């Protein structure tokens, strides 16, 4: 199974993503980080293949963490999660920094799994 780390400051969003991922049969959720700094630490300890990370979080946000991860770990695939939709500077910046895709909130299980499977 492919290991996925969920990063979101909202526990309800994180739990929803974890449930979708765990019930898929293709992926296993290896943990939940509440901000970018925790995500970077957990990337070292849990060694996920994929990180689903919120863009806007207190402390270290998703884009800052993505900048760090793209330098430190070229293998991990990062998918950003946002309520901003597919437009705007942050969306473009995430893709420029190496995000593989963006999941828009509110999300549906089929769309989340399609994006993860395409990686």
Describe each model-derived feature in a short phrase.
Residues 2-13, 17-21:
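Conserved acidic segment of CheY-like receiver
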Residues 26-34, 42:
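Short hydrophobic/Thr-rich beta-strand motif most characteristic of the beta2 strand and flanking loop
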Residues 35-38, 61-64:
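Acidic catalytic/metal-coordinating carboxylates
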Residues 46-52:
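Active-site beta3 strand of CheY-like receiver
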Residues 57:
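Receiver (REC) domain active-site loop signature in two-component systems and cognate sites
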Residues 64, 85-101, 114:
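Alpha4 helix (beta4-alpha4-beta5 surface) of REC/receiver domains from two-component response regulators
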Residues 81-82:
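Hydrophobic/aromatic residues positioned on beta-strands within the core alpha/beta folds
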Residues 107-116:
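C-terminal output helix
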């Amino acid at each position: 199974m492919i290991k996925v780390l969920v990063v979101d400051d909202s526990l309800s969003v994180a739990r929803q993503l974890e449930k979708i991922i765990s019930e898929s049969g293709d992926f296993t959720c290896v943990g939940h980080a509440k901000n970018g700094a925790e995500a970077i630490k957990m990337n070292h300890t849990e060694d996920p293949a994929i990180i689903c990370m919120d863009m806007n979080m207190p402390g270290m946000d998703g884009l800052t963490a993505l900048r760090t991860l793209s330098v430190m770990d070229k293998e991990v695939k990062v998918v950003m999660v946002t309520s901003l939709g597919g437009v705007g500077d942050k969306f473009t910046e995430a893709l420029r920094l190496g995000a593989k895709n963006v999941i828009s909130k509110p999300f549906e299980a089929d769309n989340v799994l399609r994006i993860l499977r395409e990686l």
